[in-house]
Design a protein with these regions (language model features):
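Charge-dense, helix-prone N-terminal extensions
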Residues: 2-279
Length: 279
């Protein structure tokens, strides 16, 4: 074989490999750009809204657990601190909302309530803050970083979950009315089985997230709003418990009324306009 032909074949192979690498890099770059922009569209919540935040949540996607499975709670239900505070729950009608692929922020993609329902939901949280004013107050969310949360006044005196969450018990995502709440294992099982929410995909995976950190779907009507009020009350009862209660033996601390009641609130932002960043 002529020497020039012998060298031509490796050069062709190297050129082909280089072109293939360029094509793959271009496709990967295009996918990354689309994925990054779609993630930004969810709004802020827990991570910085920049490439660093996207890289973190992209890595955490690999660690997500099944958000609907309740087997994780089976071993906990009969242990101290896992008692039920909820009564029987009716099943939520219709399919569950579609949930975005990224674990942070944890958001849904459809079934959004109207502004009137979001306002009514804020009133439910306001009422809970007043009812349990001796035990909880409104404070900047430890998890979301940008909006308010129902938080224990003294996390050290509450359930071990409260110490893990810095006292945070529940918060609303102002853009769509979805929520996160922390329940007992028994109540988390009931909420998931009845279709009212799902487990955060990193709950129990990351050490700072209790395994019963649950995403609660936003209410669509008055009947569902009443269910959410029950869920919120159960979450507060769980977090203010001593951690030694067992099924049928609730030993949570009753809230003490303050001497001078104060108006507390968890006000959300109005729905964002297209392209606007939200929590």
């Amino acid at each position: 074989m002529p020497i020039d032909q012998a060298y031509a074949k490796p050069r062709t192979m190297r050129r082909t490999a280089a072109l293939a690498a360029i094509a793959v890099a271009a496709l990967a770059g295009a996918w990354a750009r689309r994925d990054y922009l779609a993630w930004l569209a969810l709004g802020e919540g827990g991570l910085p809204a920049n490439p660093k935040g996207w890289l973190i949540t992209s890595y955490l996607r690999l660690r997500k657990a099944d958000p609907i499975a309740t087997a994780v709670y089976d071993a906990q239900i009969h242990t101290p601190g896992a008692a039920a505070h909820l009564g029987p729950l009716p099943g939520r009608r219709g399919p569950r909302p579609r949930i975005a692929a990224w674990p942070i922020p944890h958001r849904q993609l459809d079934q959004f309530p109207g502004p009137e329902m979001r306002t009514a939901l804020e009133r439910v949280f306001d009422d809970a803050l007043r009812t349990h004013a001796g035990a909880v107050h409104s404070k900047l969310s430890h998890f979301e970083k940008r909006n308010s949360a129902v938080t224990l006044r003294d996390p050290a005196a509450g359930h071990p979950d409260a110490r893990l969450s810095k006292g945070e018990t529940a918060h609303i995502h102002p853009n769509d009315g979805s929520m996160h709440m922390i329940f007992s294992a028994a109540d988390a099982t009931s909420v998931l089985d009845a279709g009212w929410g799902e487990r955060h995909p990193l709950a129990g995976v990351l050490p700072e997230l209790p395994s019963t950190y649950i995403y609660v779907y936003p209410p669509r009507d008055g009947a569902e709003l009443a269910i959410v009020a029950q869920l919120l009350n159960a979450a507060i009862e769980h977090m203010t418990s001593t951690g030694t209660d067992q099924s049928g033996d609730r030993q949570h601390r009753p809230p003490k009324a303050p001497t001078t009641p104060r108006r507390t609130h968890l006000r959300g932002a109005p729905p964002p306009t297209p392209g606007q960043r939200h929590e």
